[in-house]
Amino acid sequence: ENPNGLILGTPGSGKSFAAKREMTNAFLITDDDIIICDPEAEYFSLVQRLGGQVIRLSPAGKGMDGKPQYVNPMDINLNYSEDDNPLALKSDFILSLCELVIGGKEGLQPVEKTVIDRAVRNVYRPFLADPDPAKMPILGDLYNELLKQPEPEATRIAAALELYVSGSLNVFNHRTNVELSNRLVCFDIKQLGKQLKKLGMLIVQDQVWNRVTVNRAEKKACLLYT
């Protein structure tokens, strides 16, 4: 069976209603985890009624209650199977993140990929030796490590990251302070704006992959709606 699906229709034909009904049915009659990437803030009321967790990502870093809400793109999940390498998977994600931040049609050059991978391994080495969540690396740690590298490419990458570390778009330079283990989680990304929306969607995808990896070992499904 194909695990993917589309809900198609003309505007006003009930696509959102159909999705909400499907989510509700899955929530009530299965034990599947449900994660929603919500670009239009359509699903938060349903999620709240079902006792789920709504995470509003915005440039200000404030949730629906006005309190800070952060999701750390550097979060690393160590609960992988023996066949997976958590550090290699996280390095691959960080490469995708840097490629999105730097932009350009050609993407990252081989030397840039090597520099980023080296910096990622250096940043996570202390954490992997003592995996304390309070010491989870953040983007600022990667930025500082890149500045230590001798290659000029490292300086270029760090300069591109600066906007997201100490600049006005630094919402993702914080440790995660929201509960992500709820069975029903909705990521409201409507307020992220043009500059942050693609980055926000990539980070949500990484959080989904973390959940899928954990659930795979438990023989539990994870449904993603976006």
Regions picked out by a protein language model, each given a short descriptive name:
Residues 1, 44-53, 57-67, 72-224:
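P-loop NTPase motor domains
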Residues 1-59:
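Glycine-rich phosphate-binding loop of nucleotide-binding enzymes
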